């Protein structure tokens, strides 16, 4: 039997994506100024980034990066367990753990790497199982597959479904894993109920709060704190540094024994160069601002309310989200692509989310809000969406990249 040719396979898959009009294209950003982006020589108002608190270009954050780069250079030069673990890394781990009320923390290069590290290190036997919400982030789902343990999924937000899946896999060690805020819907997991399920089934409860920390809860401590939970109920939690904190990387906070086990055994941690100290210094400055500046969260609450009120007024179908992620359901791919193009023509950058990222028939505009947006910009966006809907409804639709 002839071995399959990889180039032929890739070519066939590419042709299929073209036929389905699902080719993905990177847009090149020339410059950025707050929520404004220069793309193809035009300045657009962006409602598509994860810079929820507006910290990525904040003066103190940028100054911290510049000062640390001048002192420590561009990179860590080694993994954490060789000579890449700088004072900046240690300080950031300590302050994030203290902020979130956890005894220990461990830095990773990204949330994807962190989720893989957690599951590979903790679910190491083939009978082990990870039970997950069906709409969890791809990094959580892929991590289970790569770890080699069993994956069981329950319907979105279905606490009884989580219980059934755990009861149906009693043989090995178990983890119950969920997003805190779901990145495509913007809704929040029922953490208190899920924590009880995990306790009853002797499963480790793990929360990926990439989109919650910095935005929700007291002092921006995220979904876990907002639900009145802590390390006793959620022994392990993921925090990404590239969303509300405006930087790059991730931190896993948790029980000391669990975090120590990750540091000593997790291959994605052991065999990866540490984050650049300058980037870590910038994130440390962002953490301190996120803890201090409650006005940023208050501004977000106002903007979220204004957007939802305006969208409802014009008859748009909203999802159950009180977070900065505000999806507008459009249904078909062709519709959402045409809407996104019309908004760009009007001066706004809004992400068009389509299958396979979301289910068939659930394509949507994913509006994301930042504390740097103004009420005027939000109202202008709503007016532009209304106009785009009117234009799109009058023309034949064809999906495009």
From Swiss-Prot:
The gene is bioF. The modification N6-(pyridoxal phosphate)lysine is found at residue 243. It catalyses: 6-carboxyhexanoyl-[ACP] + L-alanine + H(+) = (8S)-8-amino-7-oxononanoate + holo-[ACP] + CO2. GO terms for biological process: biotin biosynthetic process. The keyword Transferase applies. It is an enzyme of class 2 (transferase). This is 8-amino-7-oxononanoate synthase. Homodimer. Belongs to the class-II pyridoxal-phosphate-dependent aminotransferase family. BioF subfamily. NCBIfam families: bioF.
């Amino acid at each position: 039997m002839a071995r399959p040719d990889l180039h032929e396979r890739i070519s066939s898959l590419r042709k299929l994506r073209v036929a389905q009009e699902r080719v993905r294209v990177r847009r090149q950003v020339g410059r950025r100024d707050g929520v404004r982006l220069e793309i193809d020589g035009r300045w657009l108002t962006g409602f598509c980034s994860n810079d929820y608190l507006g910290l990525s270009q904040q003066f103190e954050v940028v100054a911290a990066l510049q000062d640390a780069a001048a002192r420590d250079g561009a990179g860590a030069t080694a993994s954490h367990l060789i000579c890449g673990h700088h004072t900046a890394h240690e300080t950031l781990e300590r302050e994030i753990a203290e902020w979130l009320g956890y005894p220990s923390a461990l830095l990773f290069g990204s949330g994807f790497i962190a989720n893989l590290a957690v599951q590979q290190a903790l679910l190491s036997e083939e009978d082990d199982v990870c039970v997950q919400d069906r709409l969890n982030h791809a990094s959580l789902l892929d991590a289970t597959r790569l770890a080699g343990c069993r994956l069981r999924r329950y319907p979105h937000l279905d606490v009884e479904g989580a219980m059934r899946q755990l009861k149906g896999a009693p043989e090995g060690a178990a983890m119950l894993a969920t997003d805190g805020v779901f990145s495509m819907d913007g809704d929040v997991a029922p953490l208190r109920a899920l924590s009880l399920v995990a306790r009853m089934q002797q499963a480790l409860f793990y929360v990926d709060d990439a989109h919650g920390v910095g935005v929700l809860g007291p002092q921006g401590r995220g979904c876990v704190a907002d639900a009145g939970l802590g390390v006793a109920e959620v022994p392990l939690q993921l925090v990404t540094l590239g969303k509300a904190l405006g930087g790059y990387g991730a931190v896993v906070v948790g029980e000391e024994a669990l975090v120590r086990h990750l540091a000593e055994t997790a291959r994605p941690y052991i065999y990866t160069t540490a984050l650049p100290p300058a980037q870590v210094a910038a994130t440390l400055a962002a953490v301190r601002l996120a803890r201090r500046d409650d006005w940023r969260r208050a501004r977000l609450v106002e903007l979220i309310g204004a957007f939802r009120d305006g969208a409802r007024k014009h008859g748009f179908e909203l999802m159950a989200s009180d977070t900065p992620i505000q999806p507008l359901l459009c249904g078909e791919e062709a519709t959402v692509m045409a809407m996104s193009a019309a908004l760009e023509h009007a001066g706004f950058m809004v992400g068009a989310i389509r299958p396979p990222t979301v289910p068939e028939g659930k394509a949507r505009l994913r509006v994301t809000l930042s504390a740097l947006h103004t009420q005027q910009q939000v109202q202008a966006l709503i007016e532009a969406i209304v106009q785009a809907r009117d234009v799109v409804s009058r023309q034949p639709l064809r999906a495009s990249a």
